[in-house]
Amino acid sequence: MKTSRRLLASLLSCAAATLPVLHLHAADFDVVVYGGTSAGVIAAVQAKKMGKTVVVVGPDKHLGGLSAGGLGFTDTGNKAVIGGLSRDFYHRVWAHYDQPIAWTWQKKDQYGNKGQGTPAIDGAQRTMWIFEPHVAEKVFEDYVKENQIPVHRDEWLDRAKGVKKNGARIASITMLSGKTYTGKMFIDATYEGDLMAASGVDYHVGREANSVYGEQWNGVQVGVLHHRHHFGAVTSPISPYVIPGDPKSGVLPRISTNHPGVYGAGDTKVQAYCYRYCVTDVPENRIPFPRPDGYDPKQYELLVRVYDAGWKETFGKFDPIPNHKTDSNNHGPFSSDNIGFNYDYPEASYERRREILREHETYQKGWLYFIANDPRIPKDVQAAMQKWGLPKDEFKDNGGWPHQIYVREARRMIGHYVMTENELLKKRPTPESVGMGSYTIDSHNVQRYITPEGHVQNEGDIGAPTMGPYEIAYGSLVPKKGQADNLFVPVCVSSSHIAFGSIRMEPVFMILGQSAATAAVMAMDSGIAVQDVPSAKLREHLLKDGQILELPAPAPKAKKK
């Protein structure tokens, strides 16, 4: 009896000792998706629908990226180009709001139905383009549950030594936790492109000079003032100095003293990030704007001068989403965009990125608190802001604050084909379309500087129309051959800074995620490199799945007699 007990104890001890090791053994899948963004979830769903084993692994605790992180006022562009699973997402949103129970804080017929270039609710097409964050997150969670896709959350790629390759193919990726994932195909669906970079793939950070790809809107854009996110939008020039007009008094916070650069030149700077914060004016659901830790009212001295110079558009991008809430975006010369404080984010360590995120959160929460409480704010603006607050029923585990910052741009792959403004403007045809984009060529401000005249000004904000919807090349999803022959990159796509300004919209990321997964399965089944997937067969499959690869050319205008 004692011998049996000793044997049992010994076996249990051995089992306990081996459990952690088993936990860290490689998990093998056909397709490994790194990143739980909208593109990542859609890519995983497509791979599973095509009969493959797939896992979504990444740092995310919440699925859906920006689509579930506050960006509910969708950058739709031309909705006719949104097909496949991307369109299905917006159909599922429509189905949710088609139920009376979804309208918690207002009746459906009281909602204004405003969208970006399209009605929010498109009953004829059974789609809805505007939504609350928690609704989007539920749709993404439903996708993985329905398709029985495992999701491994809060797993961070070991960027230094976690990518193992056999020649030009990725064999496995290992997380900082020690967990390893082997796969036949890999998809980097992160906003940062961490897997892409760690795999030895070429990429770029910042703006290329216009001369690199023969563009107009890339590079430094000193003197170009689009939209109203610049200091020309107020009635008089604003001094950047602590004592107006006196350089010796020092420069106000959040203004760079560096030269902005020469028009058209490249740099390594990144367009501004912000949180797409959601607010509500329903008293029962409203959390007053909190005073953040580290709050410093001096950081907003420039904002006081903006109001003194006649700014009256504080609420210009409090865009309405259902149930008396907003998707709130940057608007104006000094707003929620934290200009100049994200330059090192794309390449930064995880710890440094956390510092950047904390600084952005402090700045943006402080901006709201300052407007709602500082006595120097115009009384009408302050009274209006005090009617708003963070919603109790959104981002419940984060005090009503979004869990995902808007990484508008980080790394961009330099891949098999580089998309530029020339394809978007129809100056050059796009080969092998795998989806379409249509949104305006859009970059937010990159820097805030002092002009030669001694005034403060912003630089980098661009809003230029495309020549209608445009195709996106398959080659922009894959690296150069020989660098990573089983990797797809549907978010940090191969494109110039300014082309990415239009491509970078959430509906397009979902389109490209589905196309990437389709091609990944085809490459795997044929035993070929991702760069060698036959275009005609891929096109056939994408069309069968409802993807839109081109629109009919407009009829030529009749000649005047």
Task: Briefly describe each language-model feature range.
Residues M1-R5:
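N-terminal secretory signal peptides that target proteins for export/translocation
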Residues A9-H23:
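Bacterial N-terminal signal peptides
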Residues A47:
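Aromatic pocket-lining residues of Rossmann-like dinucleotide-binding sites
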